[in-house]
From Swiss-Prot:
<dbReference type="GO" id="GO:0044011">
    <property type="term" value="P:single-species biofilm formation on inanimate substrate"/>
</dbReference>
<dbReference type="InterPro" id="IPR004331">
    <property type="entry name" value="SPX_dom"/>
</dbReference>
<keyword id="KW-0479">Metal-binding</keyword>
<protein>
    <recommendedName>
        <fullName>Transcriptional regulator of yeast form adherence 3</fullName>
    </recommendedName>
</protein>
<dbReference type="InterPro" id="IPR017907">
    <property type="entry name" value="Znf_RING_CS"/>
</dbReference>
<dbReference type="GO" id="GO:0006357">
    <property type="term" value="P:regulation of transcription by RNA polymerase II"/>
</dbReference>
<keyword id="KW-0863">Zinc-finger</keyword>
<feature type="domain" description="SPX">
    <location>
        <begin position="1"/>
        <end position="360"/>
    </location>
</feature>
<feature type="zinc finger region" description="RING-type">
    <location>
        <begin position="398"/>
        <end position="437"/>
    </location>
</feature>
<dbReference type="Pfam" id="PF15227">
    <property type="entry name" value="zf-C3HC4_4"/>
</dbReference>
<dbReference type="GO" id="GO:0008270">
    <property type="term" value="F:zinc ion binding"/>
</dbReference>
<keyword id="KW-0805">Transcription regulation</keyword>
<comment type="function">
    <text>Transcription factor required for yeast cell adherence to silicone substrate.</text>
</comment>
<keyword id="KW-0804">Transcription</keyword>
<dbReference type="GO" id="GO:1900189">
    <property type="term" value="P:positive regulation of cell adhesion involved in single-species biofilm formation"/>
</dbReference>
<dbReference type="InterPro" id="IPR013083">
    <property type="entry name" value="Znf_RING/FYVE/PHD"/>
</dbReference>
<dbReference type="InterPro" id="IPR001841">
    <property type="entry name" value="Znf_RING"/>
</dbReference>
Length: 494
């Protein structure tokens, strides 16, 4: 299926809002613009295959002692900005006829000149043969839509500097009148002082193509900012309700269980990994994970235990926020694909090679093209504002017994353990940290290593676990006392 149809179908099936559709990459309109670029190039005699050969020839090996490339004919498509702060793209096709290399015989130069004669004959259309400024050819459409060639000197319309290093004494183009003078003589018999001729060609439709694409990226930037602001507001509302609900112990445990299922489903990220530069999940993966979360949530039966109206409303808002973010990511994905496809089609139709140069040139101009992904930034806010509001037991578990680390001892290396496990290790003459192996970390631990802040948090948010931990500790102590009591000699009645 053609991508244009796929794009239309996706926007319809995903129920994308109309204002989003209007801000999307207008793939069909850009395709029509590319066709006009092709027509203009062919109008100038620069067919796709011809340009492909010339553009491929622009990369040459240059020895350290050489100042001139060895290609006698070079074509280069240059994209630049109109100014440092501007976002507008100025495209220009540069054709260089370089006869300065001694590696090419006169016959070879004549052969190359004949091949290019018909292509550039219409470009060199100025009767003034005296000035020695570089030639700029610009295409314009007249009122009837027909193409016209407009020529100018470098002083009136300066081309951008070439990306290739120019020779120290590069001569300028000798301009000839293609209708009234002998172009063969000008092209095929370059004199000793003018061995490098440069022509800058400004098309009409490629400028419109980049202007249209830039406008659409601006629209996507605006939409992204608007939707990001909406989601952040949704997150704030949910965070406010969750903060209120966590004060009630019964609701606290329900929401902790709900968030545990959410984290285990890894909808957008792995817990505590949103700030890592890991590869972003595709929108298909996210949708699958979100569906998995809903399935696991139904299996757990958590929702049947939600009795308070506020809890149900907050949960519904939480789900709406997730699906809102998913829809934005799906929209971003299809637009990223549309941008990639349209740049690829531009190159396929014209051989001008913008797939790498254009994104690099505008990478800092658009939110859509730069910075961390929307999913990563929003998910970080979700984690910090909502998920971490209700602490997870895994964050306060002892790595040795895997139960809550009460009473918590923080060793000098920073790792947290329950005091009971550390006492056992010390009794077994194990004095290094079990995780990082820091020597004598357990040996030198004392009452000052008791993490009072974590202990208060555990009592507040994990009252059931703390109570169970104390019960297990007392039971263990009782068993130890019995064991010690039974280890002595038994009384024997004679």
């Amino acid at each position: 299926m053609k991508f244009a149809k796929t794009l239309e179908r996706t926007l319809e099936e995903d129920e994308i809002p109309q204002e989003w559709v209007e801000a999307a990459i207008q793939y069909k309109a850009l395709k029509k613009c590319i066709n006009k670029v092709v027509n203009e190039l062919e109008f100038l005699g620069l067919q796709k295959n011809t340009l492909k050969i010339l553009l491929n020839d622009k990369v040459v090996e240059v020895n350290e002692q050489e100042t001139n490339p060895s290609n006698p004919i070079i074509a280069e498509y240059i994209l630049s900005k109109t100014s440092t702060d501007a976002h507008n793209i100025k495209p220009m096709l540069k054709i260089t006829l370089d006869y300065s290399s001694e590696d090419y015989t006169k016959d070879h130069i004549v052969e190359l000149g004949k091949e290019l004669k018909q292509k550039i004959e219409a470009l060199l259309n100025d009767s003034d043969t005296e000035y020695e400024e570089d030639k700029i050819i610009e295409l314009k459409e007249d009122d009837g839509g027909d193409l016209q060639i407009v020529t100018s000197r470098e002083g009136s319309l300066s081309p951008p500097a070439s990306r290739m290093a120019s020779p120290p004494t590069s001569p300028t183009l000798k301009v000839v009148d293609s209708l009234n003078t002998n172009i063969d003589e000008a092209l095929l018999s370059p004199d000793d002082h003018h061995k490098k001729h440069e022509i800058f060609i400004m098309l009409n439709s490629d400028s419109k193509f980049f202007e249209m694409l830039n406008d659409e990226l601006n629209s996507l930037d605006t939409l992204t900012q608007q939707e990001e602001s909406k989601i952040i507001e949704e997150v704030k509302k949910i965070a406010k309700y969750v903060n209120e609900l966590k004060l009630k112990q019964s609701e606290l445990y329900k929401w902790r269980e709900l968030f545990k299922v959410y984290l285990d489903s890894e909808v957008y990220f792995k817990y505590n990994e949103t700030a890592l530069p890991s590869q972003q999940k595709s929108s298909e993966q996210i949708k699958s994970n979100l569906d998995l979360f809903v399935t696991n949530l139904n299996k757990s039966g958590i929702m049947t235990r939600f009795k308070k109206k506020q809890s149900l409303e907050t949960f519904n808002q939480f789900m709406e926020m997730n699906y809102h973010l998913l829809k934005i990511l799906q929209f971003q994905t299809i637009n990223n694909e549309a941008l990639r496809k349209i740049l690829k089609k531009f190159d396929k139709q014209t051989s001008l090679g913008i797939q790498k140069t254009f994104p690099k040139l505008i990478s800092n101009d658009h939110i859509f093209m730069s910075g961390s992904s929307l999913a990563q930034s929003i998910c970080y806010i979700i984690q910090e504002s909502i998920i971490k509001v209700i602490p997870q037991l895994d964050d306060y578990s002892c790595p040795i017994c895997m139960n809550i680390a009460y009473k918590p001892i923080r060793l000098s290396c920073g790792h947290l353990f329950c005091v009971r496990c550390l006492v056992k290790m010390k009794q077994d003459d194990k004095t290094s940290c079990p995780l990082c192996r820091k020597e004598n970390a357990i040996l030198y631990a004392d009452s000052s290593n008791l993490d009072l802040e974590s202990m208060e948090l555990m009592k507040k948010y994990f009252p059931r676990e703390v109570k169970e931990k104390l019960r297990e500790r007392d039971k263990e102590r009782y068993n130890e006392l019995r064991k010690n009591a039974n280890s002595g000699e038994k009384c024997i009645v004679m």
